């Protein structure tokens, strides 16, 4: 049974944020081989886990690959497999390749054209390499995905008018507060999404930006870029009272802000409204915070309306991008099928070379002692014959194997025609048997 590429995942379309955070596979709680062991069934694996999707790429043999991934994934999160199954999609072969290329090109993102997903995919690939979880197929596939994403960016306008999740968050704040120049914002977390949010807040005219991060130095570095103020993480709740808008995007595995924490903050603010946007998955802010008076909490799923407006501007460019994806999916499929053909070509050449060497040995035995020049000439002649005799069959197989449906059939015919799977009978035995029949 030949190896194939499988992609098993869930995303913002198939699962709400509550489900996505339950089944998130972040770096701290999972290793690729901890979810799906590398063995005879699964030979390669990569995990992509972001705020909007969790996807597992696997190379393996047979339908057991999918069941093994689902079983390992749910177990890694301490959940039941039947709770995961309703939200999951499964792609195999060309569909898996196509889906990955769409993801890398940001055509499958909540915000089509956003640049973050490519960086997240590269990071996931780097970690998989470090853990020795990728081989020939995933290495080739991921590099191709990166080049497809580059083609989409350079040959279409998909990314030119793209918004990010951070942009959508700031747009939502502007709709609620209107003019931003009299309000202050706090960013919790100092990663890429926080940096983008700071950029958009500054452009919107926010009067002050605070940055709270577990690593104070990183928070101070980000705050310095935007003339903001860095806050020690342990002082977070003391300083929350200074902020009207809070955008949180940490990598925490459980809520860092709860309703009981905000009650005292509100009292010190004299119950002036607070606007929280939680763009982390798992969520940083307990949903119960939204039950407090004068507190407005939005999570990543609430940004869809802002995103939809932006999507309409880019549908035509997305259509051009999908054409590129289809073209590259076909090319990669041809390369993948060529891998299936390679063992047959190698076996055919080795068989021919064995026959040639056996015949050379038999001829030299009949001739008796020959000088080195004669021996070299005989070997060169046989080598040339092997090459020329194999040229047509190999060319034919390569040409026919590029046909997706017919390829495996021609491999099977070739292997039977040339006895490539007959390990018990040496190639020269067939020749001897035929000679014996002819002599009689």
Swiss-Prot record:
Possesses an unusual extended V-shaped dimeric structure with each monomer consisting of three distinct domains arranged along a curved 'spinal' alpha-helix. The N-terminal catalytic domain specifically recognizes the glutamate moiety of the substrate. The second domain is the NADPH-binding domain, and the third C-terminal domain is responsible for dimerization. Belongs to the glutamyl-tRNA reductase family. Keywords: NADP, Oxidoreductase, Porphyrin biosynthesis. It comes from Nitratidesulfovibrio vulgaris (strain ATCC 29579 / DSM 644 / CCUG 34227 / NCIMB 8303 / VKM B-1760 / Hildenborough). Pfam families: GlutR_dimer, GlutR_N, Shikimate_DH. The active site is at residue 51. This is Glutamyl-tRNA reductase. PROSITE patterns: GLUTR. GO terms for biological process: protoporphyrinogen IX biosynthetic process from glutamate. It comes from the Bacteria. The record marks 99 as: Important for activity. During catalysis, the active site Cys acts as a nucleophile attacking the alpha-carbonyl group of tRNA-bound glutamate with the formation of a thioester intermediate between enzyme and glutamate, and the concomitant release of tRNA(Glu). The thioester intermediate is finally reduced by direct hydride transfer from NADPH, to form the product GSA. GO terms for molecular function: glutamyl-tRNA reductase activity; NADP binding. InterPro entries: 4pyrrol_synth_GluRdtase, 4pyrrol_synth_GluRdtase_dimer, 4pyrrol_synth_GluRdtase_N, GluRdtase_CS, GluRdtase_dimer_dom_sf, GluRdtase_N_sf, NAD(P)-bd_dom_sf, Shikm_DH/Glu-tRNA_Rdtase. Catalyzes the NADPH-dependent reduction of glutamyl-tRNA(Glu) to glutamate 1-semialdehyde (GSA). Its EC number is 1.2.1.70. Substrate binds at residues 50-53, 109, 114-116, 120. It catalyses: (S)-4-amino-5-oxopentanoate + tRNA(Glu) + NADP(+) = L-glutamyl-tRNA(Glu) + NADPH + H(+). It is an enzyme of class 1 (oxidoreductase).
